[in-house]
């Protein structure tokens, strides 16, 4: 099995699931036990500063309102009360797990409270919940043509507007996702 960690899953236009329709998922883990990822294009309508207030977490000395005004994303349907921060690498985040060169994941509160301060990760995504697959489940969904995959790209992850990520991800494959047939065949 080839690991798809550090890849994007792009929902096929034919994917008939109200949660996953037109989603782009960053795969944080993928091994023989299953897979875990974060949906990166479904804002919850909550800003990071509001989330910090709801959690009674004091923000450090804020140097930019832009970071605290970032949207919290709906990371997936599993454990929606659990927060994840996907962020660019910083040397002082011991509780963050390195996923790839330059990208880390944490559930630690210290990164959340540092957002917007001098210690803030340069780029980040805050998400509630995650998408999870049991052993061989993702492989079956790929065989069923539910998803397309491409290597992850930090520009798409952090610099493209949420509402444009699905379209941009499909264009990275060289076509517009809407040009695909909703019917899949197997030869």
Curated annotation (Swiss-Prot):
One Pfam family this sequence matches: DUF179
Protein origin, superkingdom: Bacteria
Coiled-coil ranges from the UniProt annotation: none
InterPro entries from the UniProt entry: AlgH-like
SUPFAM superfamilies referenced in this protein's UniProt entry, alphabetically: VC0467-like
Cellular component terms per the entry's GO annotation: cytosol
HAMAP family tied to this protein: UPF0301
Family the UniProt entry places it in: Belongs to the UPF0301 (AlgH) family.
UniProt name for this protein: UPF0301 protein Shewana3_1200
Taxonomic source organism: Shewanella sp. (strain ANA-3)
């Amino acid at each position: 099995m080839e690991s798809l960690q550090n890849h994007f899953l792009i929902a096929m236009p034919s994917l008939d699931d109200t949660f996953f329709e037109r989603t782009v998922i960053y795969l944080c883990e993928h091994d023989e036990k299953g897979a875990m990822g974060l949906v990166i294009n479904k804002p919850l309508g909550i800003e990071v500063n509001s989330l910090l207030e709801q959690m009674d977490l004091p923000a450090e000395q804020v140097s930019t309102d832009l970071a605290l005004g970032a949207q919290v994303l709906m990371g997936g349907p599993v454990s929606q009360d659990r927060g994840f921060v996907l962020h660019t690498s910083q040397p002082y985040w011991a509780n963050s797990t390195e996923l790839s060169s330059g990208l880390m994941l944490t559930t630690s509160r210290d990164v959340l409270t540092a957002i917007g301060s001098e210690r803030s990760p340069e780029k980040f995504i805050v998400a509630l919940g995650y998408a999870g697959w049991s052993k061989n489940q993702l492989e079956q969904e790929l065989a069923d043509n539910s998803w397309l995959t491409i290597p992850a790209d930090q520009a798409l992850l952090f610099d493209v507007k949420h509402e444009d990520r699905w379209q941009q991800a499909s264009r990275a494959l060289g076509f517009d996702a809407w040009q695909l047939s909703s019917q899949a065949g197997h030869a």
